[in-house]
Amino acid sequence: MSNKKHSHQELYRCLGEVIAIRRKRMGLSQEELSEASGVDRSFLSSVERGKRNPSFGTVASIASGLKMRYTKLISNCEQCLQAKQAS
C-alpha cells in the first residue's frame, strides 16, 4: 500500500511540474491560467506544487486553459514519471 501511495504522490508531483512548465512556456501567470481554465488560482498553485489532487474534470479544465488536449497533458505526465523512475 505504501508503494501505491508513493506512486500517487509522484504522479501528482509530475502533473504539477508538467502544468507549471507548460504555463511558463506560454508566458502565462497562474492568475491568467486560472481565468482561462476556470480553476481557482490558489488551487492551481497547490496542484503545481503537487500538494493537491485534482479531479478528472479539473485536469481537463487546466489542459483546456493550457490549449492542449487532456491526453497530451497525461502523456507528458507519464513521460515525467518514467524519467523520475529511471533516475
Question: Which residues fall in each region the model found?
Answer:
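Short basic helix-loop element that most often maps to the first helix and adjoining turn
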Residues: 17-36, 61
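A short, Lys/Arg-rich alpha-helix, primarily the initiator
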Residues: 3-24
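DNA major-groove recognition helix of helix-turn-helix/homeodomain DNA-binding modules
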Residues: 57-72
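Conserved amphipathic alpha-helical interaction elements at protein-protein interfaces in regulatory
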Residues: 21, 25, 65-68, 79
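Short, charged recognition helix plus adjacent turn
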Residues: 2-4, 9, 74-87
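Recognition helix of helix-turn-helix/homeodomain-like DNA-binding domains
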Residues: 38-52
